[in-house]
Amino acid sequence: MEEDEFSKAYDPKGLEDKLYAFWEGSGMFTAQSASDKPPYAIIMPPPNVTGILHMGHALVNTLQDVLIRYKRMSGFEVCWVPGTDHAGIATQTVVERHLYASLGKRRIDFSREEFIKHVWEWKEKSEGVILSQLRQLGCSCDWSRLRFTMEPLANRAVKKAFKALFDKGHIYRGYYLVNWDPVLQTALADDEVEYEEKDGWLYYIRYKVVDSSEEIIVATTRPETLLGDTAIAISPDDERYSHLLGAKVHLPFVDREIPIIGDMSVDPLFGTGAVKITPAHDRDDYRTGINHNLPMVNILAPTGEINENGGIFAGLSKEKAREDIITALEAMGLFVKKEPYKLRVGVSYRSGAVIEPYLSKQWFVSVESFRDSLREFVANDSIKIFPPEFTRNYLSWVNNLRDWCISRQLWWGHRIPVWYHKSDEDRILCYDGEGIPEEVAQDPDSWYQDPDVLDTWFSSGLWPLTCLGWPDVESGDLEKFYPTAVLITGHDILFFWVTRMVLLCSAMVEEKPFSDVFLHGLIFGKSYKRYNDLGEWTYISGEEKHAYDMGKALPKDVVAKWEKLSKSKGNVIDPLEMIGKYGADAVRMTLCSCANRGEQIDLDYRLFEEYKNFANKIWNGARFIFGHISNLTSKDLVYGIDKDLLGLEDFYILDGFNQLLKQLESAYQSYAFDKITTMAYEFFRNDFCSTYIEIIKPTLYGKQGNEEDRLTKQKLLAVLLVNILGVLHPITPFVTETLFLKLKATLGDVDAPCADTITAHALDMLRAESYVVAPYPQAIDIAIPKDLHESFALAERLVYTIRNIRGEMQLDPRASLEVFVICPEGISIETYVPMMCALGGIASLEYLSEEPKDRVYSLGVVEGIRLGVFVPMEHITKERNRLEKEKMRLENSIESVSRLLSSESFRAKANPDLVRSKEETLKNNRMELQSILDKLASFS
């Protein structure tokens, strides 16, 4: 292929879709469970079917695909199972909003079956978009194994797991204080609650002691829950109140008398040392209520309003009830005061609503019997967590784990497989078969199924099993690919998801779900804001923001900050938009280069441009090589390479490539994606293109060596290109595959065996239909000279000296140089000359025994080797004139500053810093002048 058959710039548009269709249509992504190859499986963290992919999805799936492509090329039977998540709360909320916006109807306007039908329609549409986006990113998933967390297989798995845990007593139903979302009207697990610090008040309220003139004052942050108080608690050791133990106080508004109790949990230093106990609406109070056998009075409706137990305040919002209760207490003389107080408020991670501790009957997984195994899997390295510092987080969380609330008051999700007898709710049936239990079928009017659904994380916790066919095992996938190799996910769902997979999967099959866990950081984008005319912060978007993202200097009124991606902050980066603008390879390299081992990934917009340029560098580097190997065929490579014709630069690049493979193997093992990207990037750009190719260009163009030398370089270029593109392929699959197919077409079919240690593996790679199924590059078996690195380092210093002289003399960077060399006795630089000439821009080099006296030159010395660069006469005249002008300027400056510093008046009146500055200027000017005088003398 001639060089001009290539476009001058890499344009991924059109190429990417065609390549992906070729890969998928050829079945290259499909795993074979009957294969003899060692298994390597990853299950995709399923994106929610709520919309489109965001940059976090692009990151996690790029990292997985890099591993999958690397392992597939490394000879493993790779199985990457894609899938999507039904995402109970999130999807139901999105669909409810959609139906209200499009039809003006709320969920309660539909039957359960009608609403679920709408959700399935949403799922089909959204899932199709998501899967298309994954293909655009280049994800080499096994699409024949696509899963969904609400498909029939997943439902069978969920029911089987629920019943297995229920039968063993690990799942129970009971009243408990749950995290209640009054907007979504469902319970949430502890780790679905986010906490914020807010400004609030501490209210002081009088309680009148029954049959006494005494009173007791308590401090509370929530006066509205007074309606549900069932005791006042004090420390038994608090002498101020000990005489009141056993007495009762009158509870206003609801006409109840409640006891004063002693409890060691009360802090005598908080408030007045006396606290109100509301067991149905506070976790600490709940435990106190259990310990003292107190009644539990729920005063809230599921909507968050005051219920019938609130008496005259029933039907009010809790905020309005608080306001009215304080007003009424003031009128009764029972309100004392309020003080500012910092509150730690729980909010729903989905709706943003303030969470209410709420007494409710729910289903729970008892975690106590699993705590030891959860701990041991990680403590004994059966499951390794990367980065390892998150191991401590995991173990701490397991040690403090509480029972997991798994029931949700939703319509969308896996229905809890339990039926209740209408006349006796304690008579229940747990059933994991198809349809309904036989007993229910025989008497359907006497039974009803639990209306609640399971927490999304319950079905997601079984994901590694269901992805591989469990509870059906006929396919052989479970036996072949379980446990999976690694789970890649964000560190923010270590507890939401990772721990629950370990719990549920090990409980079902007595084996861990994966061997490694890699937790990536969360993506942050740069936001910019300024004060508006009202004195409020406003975020900057559009073209102005993009200009700042690309490096435009910030005005003084603009503040930049790395923040979590948010539409309101204007710092969201759409991965599909970036793919359209920069290409999938550039997006993938950007994400891999940022996948550090910290908690935060600062996604710099300029990286997309940088890696787009690198994809173009790959293209143009290959374009140059193709222009010089068009005469080669695969037979030339089969004949091999004569190692006696290899030069210093050849050994150096081959050894460098072998070292690169070792470093990459280590980086892959530790999931150091940023290092993988950087090492491959720097080797291709610096070692291969900027150094090796530049050194051999004179040979390729016939200016150095003979035809045999040229053919050797051409063969080695082809071998290196196949191998280096193979290294880059897992990260940049599209541009490398395009070039691989062109290379196959150029060299022709490989139809003969090859024993040459340099070319053999490259030919094996070229036999493959695609890089996707080609063997990964291997270290090239060649004896490396012992003094290679010392010799190359000396050659680099010689080149550096030549370049330094060029710069000091201000010679044209493109001008060819005439150079002489004087070597100490017994030292030869013959081996280095090709490299020196190519990288130093040397047109002629002669060996002398002493420095010439008839020409002007500039001299450098490296380890006793003298290098002289002759200065052209036309440059001498031009440079002498420039130096004379600079000499005059410096002499005038020296005279002026010297006169100023010699003035006693100046020194007496001037700021000492100014005097020191002038002295420094004088010193520097004198040094510069001496340098110029030396250069002028060298022209004499």
UniProtKB/Swiss-Prot annotation:
It is found in: Cytoplasm. One of its GO terms (biological process) is valyl-tRNA aminoacylation. Pfam families: Anticodon_1, tRNA-synt_1, Val_tRNA-synt_C. Keywords: Aminoacyl-tRNA synthetase, ATP-binding, Coiled coil, Cytoplasm, Ligase, Nucleotide-binding, Protein biosynthesis. InterPro entries: aa-tRNA-synth_I_CS (IPR001412), aa-tRNA-synth_Ia (IPR002300), Anticodon_Ia_Val (IPR033705), M/V/L/I-tRNA-synth_anticd-bd (IPR013155), Rossmann-like_a/b/a_fold (IPR014729), tRNA-bd_arm (IPR010978), tRNAsynth_Ia_anticodon-bd (IPR009080), Val-tRNA_synth_C_sf (IPR037118). A motif ('KMSKS' region) lies at residues 564-568. It catalyses: tRNA(Val) + L-valine + ATP = L-valyl-tRNA(Val) + AMP + diphosphate. One of its GO terms (molecular function) is ATP binding. ValRS has two distinct active sites: one for aminoacylation and one for editing. The misactivated threonine is translocated from the active site to the editing site. The C-terminal coiled-coil domain is crucial for aminoacylation activity. Catalyzes the attachment of valine to tRNA(Val). As ValRS can inadvertently accommodate and process structurally similar amino acids such as threonine, to avoid such errors, it has a 'posttransfer' editing activity that hydrolyzes mischarged Thr-tRNA(Val) in a tRNA-dependent manner. This is Valine--tRNA ligase.
